[in-house]
Amino acid sequence: MLLISGLLLTQGCLSTTPEPSVIGDLIIAEPIAISYKNEIALARLTQVLQRAEISDGQRAELFYQRGVEYDKVGLRALARFDFNQAINLKPDMSDAYNFLGIHFTQLREFNQAYDAFDSAIELAPDHEYAYLNRGIALYYGGRPNLAADDFKVFRQYQQNDPYRLLWQYLADVELDQKKANQDLVVYALQVGDRVWAKNVIKLYLGEMSQGTFIDRMAEDVNSNEALAERLCEAYFYLGKYSQLQGDANAAINFFKLALSTNVYEFVEHRYAKLELDLMRETALESREP
């Protein structure tokens, strides 16, 4: 891993002069590269789809699997094509609807995202991640009250998962900051102290400084892949934390750092780009006369 200090906030360059919005040394992982396993999986699935005589149901499953592989390496348009093909062949494929909803959210096509997630939940009422993903779509679509309801359902499936608590908090804080903080204190009691992501909760509650949080980001990580995954999460939630603190410049850089990991399939990577797009739009609108 590489340590850098003094991240230049507005230009994304390195500087020997520390900036006040960034505390301490930042950890950078080598971006995750496309593995040969992904390439082989894509080649094999394509070969079977082109040559094999199979049923529509089997073909739908193969399109779905290839869509997932495309999604893992960031080829979103190809993934969407395959998910649509899967649904055309097998209209009751809830997982394909769930993925399409995620992609529509990333494209900010929120009404289409809601429809896709509604279909996923109608087909599979216990599809817990469809509730998470619909909640995220509602959150970015400016409906935090409905998002909070979906995050609550998602949280009930595993109440000691810190990430479920964090998304609940991000919606709740839009509605009532004081109550959101009080609720997070209670929810956090169910999360073990040895779970790394509890540090994010402590940061949000003011129980840990940003500097200490950054110092602990690489704790108990023994490979570059694990480090990249950890940093993808950490920098995304630092970005959201910076937003809550009113530090837009720091938030922008943290979201860029989350993107730099190339962990395409993580929720945090997916929405770091959306966060940047939204912040750029806000900045442009504020400059207009």
Role assignments for model-derived ranges:
Residues 32-46, 74-77, 106, 140-145, ...:
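Helix-turn-helix repeat elements of alpha-solenoid scaffolds
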Residues 51, 55, 89, 123, ...:
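Structural marker of alpha-solenoid helical repeat scaffolds
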Residues 56-60, 94-95, 128-129, 161-163, ...:
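Helix-start (N-cap) detector for alpha-helical repeat units in TPR-like alpha-solenoids
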Residues 13-61, 65, 280, 284-289:
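N-terminal leader/linker segments that initiate helical-solenoid repeat arrays
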